[in-house]
Amino acid sequence: MKTRMHNGSRLLSLLLAVVLVFTLTVPALAADKPQDMNLRIAVMSDLHYLSPDMIADTADFEHALNSDRKLLKEGSSVLREMFKQVRADKPDILLVSGDLTKDGEQECHASLAKQLQQLQQDIPGLKIYVINGNHDIRNYNAKNFNTPDGKAVPATRTHPEDFKRIYDFVYSDPTVIATFTPAAGNEAGGLSYVARPVEGLTIIAMDTCRYSKENTSNGTDEHETSGAISADLEKWVIEQTAAAKARGDLVIGLEHHGLVPHFDVEPTILPMYLVNGYERIAQEYADAGMSVVFTGHMHAVDIAAMTTKAGNTFYDIETGSALTYPCPVRFVDLRRSTVGGETRTYMSVSTKTHTGPIHYTAPATGTAHVIDDLTEYAREFGFSTDMLKTVAGDFVKSFFGKYLPNDTWPVTKIVANIDQIIDDVAAVPIVDGKDLLDFANWIYQCNLAGEDDGNYPAWVQSGIDQLKSGALLDQVLNIVAKDAFGRGSVLFTKFQGLFTRYLKSQLNDLLVNIVVSMSVDNNCPDDNDKTILLEGSSAQVRLLPVTGSSAAVTQAYVQGSTATVFLTSRQLRAATNAQSGATVTVNATDPVADTVILAGHSIANARSAGVAALQVQFAAGTVTLDSDALAALDLHKDVAVSLTGASLTAAQQRALGSQAATATLASASVTVDGAAESYPAGSVRASIPARAADALTAWSLAEDGAISAVGGAWDAQQQTYTFDVVSGVTAIARFPFTDVPAGSWYYGAAAYAYNNGLFDGTSPTTFAPNAVMSRAMLVTVLWRLAGAPAPKGVNTFSDVPGGTWYTDAVTWAAENGVVSGIGGGCFAPNSNVTREQTAVILFNYAHSRGYDVGARADLSAFPDAGSVSGWAQDALSWANAAGLINGTVYGGRTILDPQGSASRAQVAKILRSYAEHVVNA
C-alpha cells in the first residue's frame, strides 16, 4: 500500500508539473497576434537646456562656453524652433534620450517640462517619453550665472525624486504600465519605466546613469559621465521585454548611454559613452526580443548594429545633440503589417538638420540675432584654441598618468605653458590655408554628422598621410618640448628621450586608428537615413536611385510590385545640390515596381527642399507631380503613385471598338492613404511610349466604357505621349476630328461612334456634330451596328437608287422591318430624321434583333407629350424608358421635341446609350 501511495504521489506530482509547465509556457509560445502599426516618432537627444534667466554676460559664463561646444546662449531659441518642427510634423510619439538640461538645474528641468507639456497640448494624441542623462541628476556643475555680482552660484540640483515629480506627466501617463523599483537602500536605475503607447509597441526607458553611492566609482551620491546597468535592472528589462514579446509587441529601448559601439575605437578611448558590459547586455536584450534602442550621449548621429549568436540583430540608433553640430532631429516612420501570415515590420529613420532661420535674442546682452542655417552656424563651434586651453590641463595629467606613470615631471612645465603650446600645435600646417585644428574639426564633425564615409577632401587625405607617416606626431612633440622647456635645453632633450620609438609607434598607431575609425563607418554607414527591416525578409529592403541635378539613393521596402520609400530632406538636398527648382526622379525600375508609395513626410520634404517636380520612373513610363500637385497634397500622409499597363472590361473593349487592338493602354493613379486625391488639373502627368500615328489623343475610359478626353501631347523626339493622370484606364488612340471639343457633352459618343465605325467623318478632320442626321444616315449607322450584312432581297423604294452608299443599308432595313418608308413606295433618304422617327426606327431595330423592348415610360410629365404622333407614342415611351431619349432643354424647359430634327451628335449619343443599355444590357 505504501508503494502504491508513493507511486501515486509521483504520478500526481508529474501531472501537476506538466500542467504547471504547460500553463506557464503556452502564453509565451502562443504570443498574441502582432498588431499592425503606422506610427511617426520624433527623436531628440542632449537638449542641454539652460534657461535664459540663468545666463549673464560674465567671466564665469564665458568660461563655461569655452569649456564646451554647446550653443548655450542660443539654446532656448533653438529648442523653440525644433519644437516648431515637431509640431509641423505631428508625430505620434516624441522620445528624448537624456541630458535634458545643461547640468541638472532643477529650474531648467521645470521650464523644459512645461515646454514639453505645451507641445503635447498642441499635438493631439502626442505621447512624450523622456529619460535622464548623465548631466541631469545630482550634478555639482549646476549653476546660475545670472547673479547680482556676476559670480556663478550653485543652482538647485535635481535628485531622482525631483525628476519623477517634474516629469510626472510622463511617469503618470496611462500608457506607462510598469516602473522599476531598485532593491531596498539602492537608487540605481530607479527612473526606468515601461510604456505601451499603442497595441503592438512597448517602449522600455532605461535609467543607465550613475548618481547613487552603490553605483558610482567613488561610492558617492554624485553624477558620473559613464553609464551602468545594475544586475537587477538588467533582469527587469529582460523580463519586461519577454512579456512584451509574449503579447505580440515590438520592443524599443530608450536610454542615454550606448549599447553598441559607434566607431571601432570607442570602447578604447571613450568607454564612458557605453554602458558597462555593453556587449553581453546588448546580446541578452536582443535575444529577449528588443530590436532597437535609441541613445544619445556622444552628440553624434550614428546607427550601429550587432547580431547575436542566435541570429537576432540589435540596432543602437544614436541621435546627436540639439545644441551641437549638426543639431539634428530624427524622424522615424514605424510600419508593421501582417501579409499572408508573415509579419513585416520596418523602421525608416531620417534626420532633419539645417534648421532655420532662427531668431534669437542673446540672454546675456539683449542683442537680436538671426541664424539662417543652424547646422552651418554650429559648424563654427567646433574645437577652438580657447576651448582646448580650458580642458587641456586635465588631459595632460591623464596622458602622463596612463602612458608615462613613472615620468610625470614634465606635467608642471607643460601645464604652465599650455596656452602657447595649444596655439602652436593648432597652427601646424596641413596644406596652405588648412591647419591641424581644421583637420581635427573635420574628422570630428564628419563623425558627429554621420558623414563618416571615407570620402576625404584632398587636404584631409594629405593630413591622414602625414599622420600615418609619423610626421605630424613629431611636429607636435617638438612644439611641446620647445614651448615647455626651451629648444636646446637639457629638459628639452630629456623630454624627447621619454618618447621612445616604441612609444611613439604606439601613440601614432592609436592616433591613426582614432582618425580612421571616426571617419570611416564600417557598421551601418547610412547613419542619417536608413530603412531597417525588423521583422520579415531582408531581401525586401532595396536601394532606389534618386536623381536631380545630382544623384543620391533612397532605401525602399519592397513587397511584391510595391516599393515604399521615405524621401528625406538629406536625400533631396543631395539630389538637388541643395538648390531649389530641380526635378527629382525616383527610379523604380530595378527592382521593378508598378506602385511607389512616397511615405511618411516625403511630400513635405520635397516641398521644403524646393523641389519643382517629383517624378517616379516606372518600367511602363513616368508619373510626374509638379509643384502645384506637391502644394495640394497632404504633407503628412502616404502618397501612392502607380503606373501599369491595363486590361479592359467588356464595356471598355466595346468603347474602343476597332482601336482596342492598337491603342496604348495605361493605368496611372495618385492616391493618398488609399483614396483618390484632388489636385490642380494638369499638375500630375504620366508619360508612356506610344505608337506613332497622326491625331493621337488620350482618353479616360470608365468601367462602363464611357469615354472622356484627357489633356495630353505627343513627343515625336521621345516617342512618348504625356497625359494628365486621371482615375481608371487611359487609352492613347487616334481621333482625327478637330470639331469635337474635349469637354463637350457628346465627345465620348462621337469617339464611340468613330471607334466602332458607325459614323464616317464629313471630312478627314471633321465630324460635323451639329449637322442634321438624314434618314439614310441613321439606317446606315444601324446597318453597320448589325455588322453590315448583305441584303437578301432587292430594293423596293423608288427614291433609293442602286449603288449608293446607303442602298444596301436601306434594303436590309426594309426587309427586316426596321423601316417601312413614308408611303407611296418612297423612303425619303435625304430627309432629316426627326426625334420620334429615330425612336421608331430604333424600336424596330431592337425588336428585329430580339432585344427586350418591353420597358415603357410615362411621358405625361413632358409639356409637349401631346404633340407626339400616334404612330410614335409607343416607341418613344420605350426609348425614354431605355434611357435613349431623355428630352432636350428648350426655353428653360425639358421637352421631347418629337418633330425636331436629330443632329449627328445627338444620334451618336443615342446610339452609345443604345449599345450599352439595350444591345449589351
Predicted feature descriptions by range:
Residues 22-33:
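Sec-dependent signal peptide cleavage junction
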Residues 31-109:
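N-terminal active-site segment of His-dependent metallophosphoesterases
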Residues 31-33, 358-547:
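Non-catalytic terminal accessory segments
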Residues 34, 90, 202-205, 216-313, ...:
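His/acidic metal-ligating clusters that form di-metal
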Residues 111-235, 310, 331:
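Extended active-site neighborhood of metal-dependent phosphoesterases/phosphodiesterases
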Residues 546-551, 556, 662, 667-755:
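Proteolytic cleavage junctions
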Residues 564-703:
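Proteolytic processing hotspots in large secreted/extracellular or virion-associated proteins
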Residues 711, 717, 722-747, 755-756, ...:
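Feature responds to low-complexity, polar/acidic, surface-exposed segments characteristic
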